């Protein structure tokens, strides 16, 4: 209602709204009558809810096997509900001219982390994650190193040379990932490096794969 009406009142089990008006309201078009809904989570309940209701399901950082397992389950729920869901993945990107340089940056980030802060977040996060019925909630199995970049961004292993990172991004795409939410250490300089050195390689890989798919058999 708050997307389409003014002075909204709502009384629910978990929150209440009184005389609320949202401005500006979302753009309303026939093609998209409401904003796309993004949901994160890891538990069985979150995956089911995402498949049934979300337009995008966002995952913490995961390796290939972890992404595939989660993606298949969420999209199975979506298919059962007669829907389609796009999939996003968190990933911390460390792109350098050599893999050695990139790994050294990773080592330095972990070494300089605020240990009490990370451990405090880990303890609270794992308590919450393990409170779910299946103990599969967010951060339930995250290590100290995973949580230095708070949403397990290092697990996606987007760390290395531009060529290595581009190949890994393409591999995630093949597995069904539609979008990567990238994090950077020094974001202004590193986004520029990523755009100049990594992204063109990703586009080259995608174009080559498309040309191969379109080639006559």
Regions found by a protein language model. Name each.
Residues 37, 50, 74, 102, ...:
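Conserved, mostly hydrophobic/aromatic
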Residues 42-43, 50:
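C-terminal module of multi-pass small-molecule transporters
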Residues 1-31, 62-174, 203-217:
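An alpha-helical appendage that flanks or caps ligand/catalytic pockets
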Residues 163-166, 172-175, 179-180, 185, ...:
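Long, low-complexity C-terminal extensions of enzymes
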Residues 45-46, 168:
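Short acidic active-site motifs
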Residues 52-53, 175:
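Structural motif
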Residues 37-40, 55-59, 85-92, 180-183:
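Hydrophobic faces of well-ordered beta-strands that scaffold small-molecule active sites
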Residues 61-65, 182-195:
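Glycine-rich, proline-tolerant flexible connector loops at the mouths of alpha/beta enzymes
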């Amino acid at each position: 209602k708050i997307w389409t009406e003014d002075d909204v009142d709502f009384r629910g089990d978990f929150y209440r709204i009184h005389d609320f008006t949202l401005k500006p309201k979302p753009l309303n078009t026939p093609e998209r009558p409401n904003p796309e809904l993004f949901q994160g989570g890891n538990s069985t309940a979150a995956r089911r809810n995402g498949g049934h209701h979300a337009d995008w399901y966002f995952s913490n950082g995961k390796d290939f096997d972890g992404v595939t397992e989660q993606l298949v389950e969420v999209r199975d729920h979506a298919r059962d509900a007669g829907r389609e869901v796009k999939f996003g993945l968190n990933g911390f990107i460390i792109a350098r001219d050599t893999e050695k340089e990139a790994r050294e940056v990773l080592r330095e980030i972990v070494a300089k982390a605020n240990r009490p802060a990370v451990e405090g977040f880990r303890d609270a996060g794992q308590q919450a994650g393990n409170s779910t019925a299946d103990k599969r909630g967010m951060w339930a199995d995250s290590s100290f190193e995973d949580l230095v970049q708070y949403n397990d961004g290092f697990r996606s292993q987007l760390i290395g040379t531009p060529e290595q990172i581009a190949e890994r991004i393409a591999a995630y795409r093949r597995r069904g990932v539609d979008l990567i939410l990238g994090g950077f250490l020094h974001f202004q300089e590193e986004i520029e490096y990523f755009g100049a050195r990594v992204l063109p390689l990703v586009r080259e890989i995608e174009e080559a794969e498309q040309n191969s798919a379109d080639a006559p058999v």
